[in-house]
């Protein structure tokens, strides 16, 4: 059933609201993907707080008009699924990971920080560790010298006690 004008305006407004908050937009062609596989992709996207939507390209073009993602409009051809996320890496990671296991999902383009990326750029962005991973690595690096120092002090204290006894 075709969308009437009000429905189209509502879709554009919804997507524009997501795009306004987004740091990353990823476009992927989904020709020939089974419904079950698309459902799995959507579930993975929900877990990572990625807004994933199949849209008419004309509606998507209107939604990105006047935003840093406007240059992506040139790439909006064919049957596309749009991944939009506030996290700089999440959309690229979700789409890239799924495309590895399902060759019918083909990454077409993406945009991050006002720059349009090709497939290789999206894959490079997806290979960056997530914010949580980076924070845990930083915490580990910061704790290592402190815990080593604490162990050295404990060993010194034990040695002094052994000498005193």
Swiss-Prot record:
Function according to Swiss-Prot or TrEMBL: Forms part of the ribosomal stalk, playing a central role in the interaction of the ribosome with GTP-bound translation factors.
InterPro entries in UniProt: Ribosomal_uL10, Ribosomal_uL10-like_sf, Ribosomal_uL10_bac, Ribosomal_uL10_bac_type
GO biological process: translation
Quaternary organization: Part of the ribosomal stalk of the 50S ribosomal subunit. The N-terminus interacts with L11 and the large rRNA to form the base of the stalk. The C-terminus forms an elongated spine to which L12 dimers bind in a sequential fashion forming a multimeric L10(L12)X complex.
Assigned protein family: Belongs to the universal ribosomal protein uL10 family.
Protein name in the entry: Large ribosomal subunit protein uL10
Gene Ontology CC terms: ribonucleoprotein complex; ribosome
Keywords carried by this UniProt record: Ribonucleoprotein, Ribosomal protein, RNA-binding, rRNA-binding
SUPFAM superfamilies reported in the protein's UniProt record: Ribosomal protein L10-like
Segments traversing the membrane: none
Top-level taxonomic group: Bacteria
Pfam families: Ribosomal_L10
CDD domains in UniProt: Ribosomal_L10 (cd05797)
GO MF entry, a single one: large ribosomal subunit rRNA binding
